[in-house]
């Protein structure tokens, strides 16, 4: 008699930072029957249904204070917990994995109420409020950065790194860039994560002319909400909302200018790309600054608060680095040293240990 496959529910929603690691994990569990838990009208509705059945619940975060809107949210939360509990019970799931965010709460509560194991992956150096609250409820919290452990004293945790998309696993096999960039020229790649970064885009456009004069090409991934798109034209300036083959692009880059979301940093590290980091100032609890600190302490990046960064300062920092190839090379080596390229494998092993014990 053939054993039925283990059923696993993955609760991951919102941005690429939550979704890409979860998808990378799922691909390492081909013998599992996996379903997804997400939120309507979020990125997962575009990425997940091609590979896994997607179940959705309505859930959102609480604002400060306890007003009518918070009571409405509380009502939705209770309804979501009951819906997830019913899904887990009727589907005979044997475990839950979550990558955090608002969706983690209903998933963890529902799973633990049924006695199911929960693996929580936290990619940030400063764990989010949801992780800090629900971490002790979980079987184990898998960490992207080991410095996060000090914020989770009551949770069982292990550092496995943050899984990257499959294109980053075989870097030598990446196809050539289909961009009009000659060989041997410095390339600056600018990106703001899966949502773009309007403020960074504005600084870059003001600073870029001096970089062109220095012979550099700029590949600027603006996101799809940039109001100033097409405002800068230059033969050495390539402007795109997104670019699919990020692994090849970051390998070609001499330098990246980026936000410091955990997913972006993980990809920079795997590719050994030196970076100038501009933490998103409105991130919850300023957690992107904690992520950036890991890289600056390791000598893999420079970091600047957005409020203190001018176009002139950014312009000069980039020019100084371009004029010092040995420094860029050392930063790239330091970034590589942070990377955990087999993170998805390590997380998959952890999931198997917890779910199958």
Curated annotation (Swiss-Prot):
The keyword Glycosyltransferase applies. GO terms for biological process: carbohydrate metabolic process; cell division; cell wall organization; lipid glycosylation; peptidoglycan biosynthetic process; regulation of cell shape. It is a peripheral membrane protein. UDP-N-acetyl-alpha-D-glucosamine binds at residues 15-17, 124, 165, 194, 288. It catalyses: di-trans,octa-cis-undecaprenyl diphospho-N-acetyl-alpha-D-muramoyl-L-alanyl-D-glutamyl-meso-2,6-diaminopimeloyl-D-alanyl-D-alanine + UDP-N-acetyl-alpha-D-glucosamine = di-trans,octa-cis-undecaprenyl diphospho-[N-acetyl-alpha-D-glucosaminyl-(1->4)]-N-acetyl-alpha-D-muramoyl-L-alanyl-D-glutamyl-meso-2,6-diaminopimeloyl-D-alanyl-D-alanine + UDP + H(+). Pathway: Cell wall biogenesis; peptidoglycan biosynthesis. One of its GO terms (molecular function) is undecaprenyldiphospho-muramoylpentapeptide beta-N-acetylglucosaminyltransferase activity. Its EC number is 2.4.1.227. Pfam families: Glyco_tran_28_C (PF04101), Glyco_transf_28 (PF03033). The keyword Cell inner membrane applies. It is found in: Cell inner membrane. Belongs to the glycosyltransferase 28 family. MurG subfamily. This is UDP-N-acetylglucosamine--N-acetylmuramyl-(pentapeptide) pyrophosphoryl-undecaprenol N-acetylglucosamine transferase. It comes from Trichormus variabilis (strain ATCC 29413 / PCC 7937).
């Amino acid at each position: 008699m053939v054993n039925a496959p283990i059923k696993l529910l993955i609760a991951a929603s919102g941005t690429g930072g939550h979704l890409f690691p979860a998808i990378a994990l799922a691909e390492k569990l081909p013998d599992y029957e996996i379903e997804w838990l997400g939120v309507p009208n979020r990125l997962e509705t575009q990425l997940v249904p091609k590979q896994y059945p997607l179940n959705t619940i309505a859930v959102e975060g609480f604002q400060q204070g306890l007003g009518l809107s918070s009571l409405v949210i509380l009502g939705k939360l209770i309804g979501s917990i009951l819906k997830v509990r019913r899904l887990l019970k009727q589907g005979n799931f044997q475990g839950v994995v979550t990558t955090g965010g608002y969706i983690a709460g209903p998933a963890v509560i529902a799973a633990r109420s049924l006695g199911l194991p929960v693996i929580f992956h936290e990619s940030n150096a400063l764990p989010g409020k949801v992780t800090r609250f629900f971490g002790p409820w979980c079987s184990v919290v898998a960490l992207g950065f080991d410095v996060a452990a000090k914020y989770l004293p009551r949770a069982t945790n292990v550092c496995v790194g943050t899984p990257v998309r499959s294109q980053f696993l075989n870097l030598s096999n990446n196809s050539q860039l289909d961009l009009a960039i000659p060989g041997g020229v410095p390339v600056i790649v600018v990106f703001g994560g899966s949502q773009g970064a309007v403020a960074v885009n504005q600084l870059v456009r003001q600073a870029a002319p001096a970089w062109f004069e220095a012979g550099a090409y700029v590949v600027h991934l603006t996101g799809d909400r940039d109001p100033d798109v097409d405002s800068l034209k230059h033969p050495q300036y390539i402007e795109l909302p997104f670019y699919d083959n990020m692994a090849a692009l970051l390998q070609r880059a001499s330098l990246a200018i980026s936000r410091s979301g955990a997913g972006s940093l993980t990809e920079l590290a795997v590719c050994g790309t030196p970076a100038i980091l501009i933490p998103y100032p409105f991130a919850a609890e300023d957690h992107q600054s904690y992520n950036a600190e890991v890289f600056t302490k390791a000598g893999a990046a420079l970091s600047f608060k957005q409020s203190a960064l001018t176009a002139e300062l950014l312009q000069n920092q980039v020019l100084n680095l371009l004029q010092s190839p040995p420094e860029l090379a050392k930063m790239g080596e330091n970034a590589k040293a942070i990377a955990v390229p087999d993170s998805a494998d390590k997380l998959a092993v952890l999931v198997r240990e917890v779910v199958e014990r």
